[in-house]
């Protein structure tokens, strides 16, 4: 069969989920292509490929773009349309929003998609395929979840070539990304993992990780085919139940490229930090989220002591690692003084980059349910009019419109202010303006530049210009689309 994966924006990072499914399908003998709809000649190229399947990976917010694009494409392309990704996993009822959505994949797609396509290709009945809600002759059939993939080492390595054939800039960028594990045992209220673990109750362990050797073998293959000078390990929490010493030994000997990974402060100790340093880790991402005890532990359910985070940051910096924190403001019931605690915590610890997000209560998360229960959502908010991105606006109720604007603008200057705290008086003046696209652009470009100071990757001028152009297209093609709750 001929499968077309379709992305409604110019991807600025590799879509690893799609890349993993591509190789599974190729191994089954299918023909697979990846398309980005804003690119020149998209429809003509897609028609020339003549796909049997249109496939979309959706997140909440992007689901609207995918659905609308699919409806437009189906006017001239006769194909079966299937959707997967986080939005579909937590809201499979999405299939009911369009008669042209033929299938929704819930959870892991590795064997779900190969089994479904095998049955379709062989003209077998497929209405009882695990992990799928499917529409056949106008009727929707709902199926159970299959067990999790336990042996991640048995899965094929991601196919990046199909992605790079459409997005040459991703091929050329010196930064590559990899997934070393699946699953997270923590129950943060704003994150999908708690609900995901509930969906998979009795279907396998919460966390599975690849062996260090398997990770290294994939990295060696990437390095051979697509030379890179920096690696991002994008696991929710890197190294859960992994042999740090073995990884450090193999990575330093076989790969030797500086990398960044996500860590949880209560899981760190001096031995693990030294292993990370030995392996070649130069920076870590750590979720602070909030320095206010009530917001952090009661609202966001982080269950972390502030001292634990402080000690972890201190230990990391003492070992020469750069610290990249993630922070959330505009939380339900949060005052500006509480948000300033988070700002001041980052300033106090001289973090290298303090990324900031506006709280978006995604459907299916605990914090969404709490917002509904306690009337923290703005009137009329639903799945299809939630803010396009947590970098834009907020759908949380504030004490006043003025207070809401204050939070939205503070977000745009949060990371800049942490690096330049003496300019806080100026930032407070800017916060009095109405939220606007200029502030959004400043935030996106400053944060992008600041990340380069974390990873410190050298790029030749042609690649640098390409990266800038790719990010500009992504900003204007996705973030700055009109949104009824972003005020833009």
Feature locations, PLM:
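C-terminal accessory regions of radical SAM enzymes
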Residues: 2-13, 17, 22, 133, ...
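Conserved strand-turn element in the central/C-terminal portion of the radical SAM core barrel
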Residues: 238, 291-296, 300-302, 313-338, ...
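Glycine-rich beta-alpha loop elements in corrinoid/cobalamin-binding modules
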Residues: 2, 10, 17, 21-24, ...
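Residue-level signal for short, function-critical loop segments
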Residues: 9-10, 60, 237, 265, ...
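Radical SAM [4Fe-4S] cluster-binding motif and immediate context
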Residues: 157-324, 344
């Amino acid at each position: 069969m001929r499968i077309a994966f379709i992305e409604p924006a110019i991807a600025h990072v590799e879509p690893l989920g799609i890349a993993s499914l591509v190789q599974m399908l190729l191994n089954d003998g299918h023909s697979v292509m990846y398309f980005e709809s804003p690119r020149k000649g998209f429809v003509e190229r897609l028609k020339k490929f003549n796909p049997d399947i249109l496939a979309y990976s959706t997140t909440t917010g992007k689901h609207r773009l995918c659905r609308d694009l699919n409806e437009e494409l189906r006017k001239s392309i006769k194909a079966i349309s299937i959707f997967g990704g986080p939005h579909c996993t937590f809201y499979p009822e999405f299939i009911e929003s369009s008669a042209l959505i033929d299938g929704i994949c819930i959870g892991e797609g590795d064997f779900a998609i190969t089994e479904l396509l095998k049955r379709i290709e062989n003209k077998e009945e497929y209405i009882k395929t695990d992990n799928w809600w499917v529409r056949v002759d106008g009727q929707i059939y709902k199926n159970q979840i299959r067990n999790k993939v336990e042996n991640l080492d048995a899965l094929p390595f991601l196919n990046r070539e199909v992605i790079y054939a459409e997005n040459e800039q991703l091929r050329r960028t010196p930064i590559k990304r990899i997934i070393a594990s699946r699953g997270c045992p923590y129950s943060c209220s704003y994150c999908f993992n708690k609900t995901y673990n509930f969906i998979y109750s009795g279907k396998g362990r919460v966390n599975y990780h690849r062996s260090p050797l398997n990770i290294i073998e994939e990295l060696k293959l990437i390095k051979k085919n697509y030379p890179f000078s920096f690696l991002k390990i994008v696991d929710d929490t890197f190294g859960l139940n992994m042999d740090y010493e073995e990884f450090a030994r193999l990575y330093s000997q076989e790969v030797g490229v500086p990398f960044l990974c996500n860590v949880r402060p209560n899981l760190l100790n001096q031995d693990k930090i030294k292993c990370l340093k030995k392996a070649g880790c130069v920076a870590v991402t750590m979720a602070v989220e909030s320095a206010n005890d009530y917001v952090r532990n009661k609202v966001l359910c982080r269950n972390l002591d502030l001292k634990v985070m402080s000690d972890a940051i201190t230990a990391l910096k003492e070992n020469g690692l750069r610290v990249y924190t993630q922070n959330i403001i505009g939380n339900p019931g949060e005052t500006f003084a509480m948000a300033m605690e988070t700002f001041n915590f980052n300033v106090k610890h001289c973090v290298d980059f303090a990324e900031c997000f506006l709280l978006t209560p995604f459907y299916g998360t605990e914090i969404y349910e709490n917002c509904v229960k306690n009337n923290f959502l703005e009137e009329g908010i639903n799945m299809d009019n939630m803010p396009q991105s947590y970098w834009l606006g907020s759908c949380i109720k504030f004490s006043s419109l003025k207070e809401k604007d204050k939070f939205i603008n503070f977000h745009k200057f949060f990371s800049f202010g942490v690096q330049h705290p003496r300019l806080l008086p100026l930032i407070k003046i800017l916060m009095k303006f109405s939220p606007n696209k200029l502030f959004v652009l400043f935030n996106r470009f400053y944060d992008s530049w600041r990340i380069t100071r974390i990873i410190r990757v050298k790029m030749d001028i042609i690649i640098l210009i390409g990266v800038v152009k790719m990010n500009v297209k992504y900003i204007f093609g996705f973030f700055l689309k009109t949104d009824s709750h972003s005020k833009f």
